């Protein structure tokens, strides 16, 4: 592989890793805010479980829909940008949430945003791994 292609794949690798790291960092910050959210909304552990159920369901469904129907039409770059935008807005919403219903409603958007980001970045990483023979994702 020539140096020009190596530079392209290096830039693609960095972009994909940033696109994966940003949501994970936001998730860690959300976990740090759980005690504050519990106190403000007077929640129980079951409430957190319902949040995770809604979040996971919307992530799986949106990931399948976007990966199969919308991403091939509009491209991965747009999907990642839209996902990060929705993720940022929903993250801010989770921090300032003031009711249990809105807390659960934001879980849907949190899941949709990761459903936009993860399939696109995973396809990029798979392509990079094929071309460079590096293992980026265990």
Please state what every model-predicted region is:
Residues 28, 56-64:
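Residue-level signature of mid-helix packing/kink "hotspots" within the transmembrane helices
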Residues 34, 38, 43-52, 136-137:
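Juxtamembrane helix-start elements in MFS-like secondary transporters
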Residues 78-92:
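Structural signature of the two symmetry-related core transmembrane helices
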Residues 116-130:
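Intracellular juxtamembrane helix-capping segments at the cytosolic ends
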């Amino acid at each position: 592989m020539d140096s020009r292609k190596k530079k392209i794949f290096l830039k693609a690798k960095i972009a994909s890793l940033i696109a994966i790291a940003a949501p994970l960092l936001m998730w860690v910050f959300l976990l740090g805010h759980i005690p504050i959210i519990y106190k403000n909304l007077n929640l129980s552990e079951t409430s957190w479980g319902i949040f995770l159920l809604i979040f996971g369901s919307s992530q799986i469904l949106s990931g399948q829909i976007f990966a199969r129907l919308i991403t091939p039409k509009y491209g991965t770059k747009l999907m990642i940008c839209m996902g990060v935008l929705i993720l940022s807005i929903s993250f801010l919403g989770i921090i300032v949430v003031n009711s249990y219903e809105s807390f659960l409603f934001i879980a849907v958007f949190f899941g949709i945003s990761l459903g936009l980001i993860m399939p696109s970045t995973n396809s990029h990483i798979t392509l990079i791994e094929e071309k460079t023979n590096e293992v980026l994702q265990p």
